[in-house]
Design a protein with these regions (language model features):
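Short beta-strand-to-loop elements that line the ligand-binding cleft
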Residues: 58-67, 168-171, 185-198
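Extracytoplasmic "Venus flytrap"
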Residues: 25-42, 63-68
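Short, polar/charged alpha-helical segment
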Residues: 34-59, 174, 178-179
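Contiguous mixed-secondary-structure segments that line small-molecule binding/active-site clefts
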Residues: 42-46, 87-186
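Bacterial N-terminal signal peptides
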Residues: 5-14
Length: 214
């Protein structure tokens, strides 16, 4: 389960009152054909527009569509984007703590537990402190989201941990990659959009990628 995704806004935008017809452009961490992307575009975005009486509208874009997935914070700071809805595990290279908040392997049983931690257990505040330490005063954490349990697909039989030995597996960066490596696999970092062709061409043997619904 991808544990925490942060909706980030530039600090100035987050603190200002919304004007009529305010449109916020957000880049997501999912590709356009994924269920999660379709849901936020068709359901979540319109719901927010209705709740705000049309004052705030969200314009979502797929992963890597405007900037590289790892560069969204700077894009928000520079005004290219007004926010992002993305996996914070992408920022593990900036601070290892993002790996723990972003992809705590087997740490939660349900998305409700993730939301409870975020909203009532101090998770959002911890994530804000982490961003403040990384890019002081630049970004505001609006909230958290969680994806469902992800699929593990493979071209080779994997019936237990021992079968992971030597398997080239697409894995999120950070803690997930460390766990797979400790199990004997060879983690490979790549975008979800590259997973399908990489499996077909033998670039990877398996993939920890996306929710089952995709």
């Amino acid at each position: 389960m991808k544990l925490l995704s942060a909706a980030l806004l530039g600090a100035g935008l987050a603190c200002s009152a919304a004007n009529a017809e305010t449109v916020l452009k957000l880049q997501t961490s999912t590709q356009s054909g994924a269920f999660e992307y379709t849901y936020v575009v068709d359901t979540w975005g319109p719901k927010l527009a209705t709740m705000t009486g049309g004052e705030v509208k969200l314009e979502f874009t797929p992963i890597n569509s405007i900037v590289d997935r790892g560069d969204t914070p700077e894009a928000v700071m520079g005004g290219v984007l007004q926010g992002d809805l993305t996996a914070v595990s992408y920022f593990t290279g900036r601070n290892p703590a993002f790996a723990i908040l972003g992809d705590l392997i087997a740490g939660y049983d349900s998305v409700d537990q993730v939301q409870t931690f975020c909203r009532h257990g101090g998770g959002r505040e911890i994530l804000q402190e982490l961003w403040d330490a990384t890019l002081p005063g630049a970004l505001h954490v609006v909230g958290c989201a969680a994806a469902a349990k992800e699929a593990l697909v493979a071209k080779v039989p994997i019936n237990g941990v021992a079968d992971l030995e030597g398997v080239k597996i697409r894995s999120p960066s950070g803690l997930a990659a460390t766990v797979f490596q400790k199990a004997g696999a060879a983690p490979v970092s790549m975008s979800l959009s590259d997973v399908f062709t990489s499996l077909e061409k033998g670039v990877i043997d398996a993939a920890d990628a996306s929710a089952y619904i995709n």
